[in-house]
Amino acid sequence: MKKRRKNTKKSLKIRVKNALKKREHIKAYRPSLPVAQSWFRTLNRGLFSGRLTEPHIHIGRLMGDWGRCCANWDNRKTRRGTYDQRVIPYGKAPIDYAIELHSKFPSWKDFIETLAHEMVHLYQMQVMEDPYSNHNENFYSFKSRFKTHGLTLYR
């Protein structure tokens, strides 16, 4: 007996569409940690083919941002001047990744698009090993993939 594999691209688009319809009346969405982790796994399977390892996710008040993707490494264990602090030192020091999300979003779609946006930065760090992981051509290469799933990739 053959097992049927779900088409993850189609199921993600349908899941986002259904969740958006279910939550369209909510004006101020407050995400919880289990919801953020669940949607991280869903978006990881649908947008990134499951290539991301789940980082620490923090939900709290952020000044001026809806989300951040952080790469933390312990520079106390490496000699000063070993690498530029503005460039992520892949292979030189162990790196811990974290995604920080604001505790309140104007709508549910803003929450999902912010989480997916930060996941693109995480993909740049974990898979592409982009030394800057900013809004460059690697970042915008995901725009068409977002569009097929009914999401928008903002700066």
List the predicted regions and their residue ranges.
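Active-site-proximal or metal-binding-adjacent scaffold patches in catalytic folds
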Residues: M1-E113, L122-R155
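Walker B catalytic acidic pair
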Residues: E118
